[in-house]
Amino acid sequence: MAEIQTVTAPVFLNQANSSSVNKHTPAEAQETFKQALSQAINNVNDLQKVSAEKTELLAKGKIEDLHDVMITGQKASITLSATVEIRNKVIEAYQEIMRMQV
């Protein structure tokens, strides 16, 4: 089975607190953000896949631990919900910036 990895905020916090942030060019900062965002989305996808695999194995009778399957499913659900909320906040912030007059 694949090991479950969680999406954590410290990756972003450590980058924001380091003094090397000021040394990045805008292109490097975009690439760093792109990599962090891509990694977070991949982690959400991995959780969804593990949940689907365990659910399928439970349905086939190969796993008898319903408790583990339910916990895995809830972790995937909560992570996806948090990701959707973050996306909504990013879109809201973008729309607010676009409404600003220059």
UniProtKB/Swiss-Prot annotation:
Signal peptide: none annotated. It is found in: Bacterial flagellum basal body. GO terms for biological process: bacterial-type flagellum-dependent cell motility. It comes from the Bacteria. It comes from Halalkalibacterium halodurans (strain ATCC BAA-125 / DSM 18197 / FERM 7344 / JCM 9153 / C-125) (Bacillus halodurans). Keywords: Bacterial flagellum. PANTHER family: FLAGELLAR HOOK-BASAL BODY COMPLEX PROTEIN FLIE, PTHR34653. Coiled coil: none annotated. Belongs to the FliE family. GO terms for molecular function: cytoskeletal motor activity; structural molecule activity. This is Flagellar hook-basal body complex protein FliE. GO terms for cellular component: bacterial-type flagellum basal body.
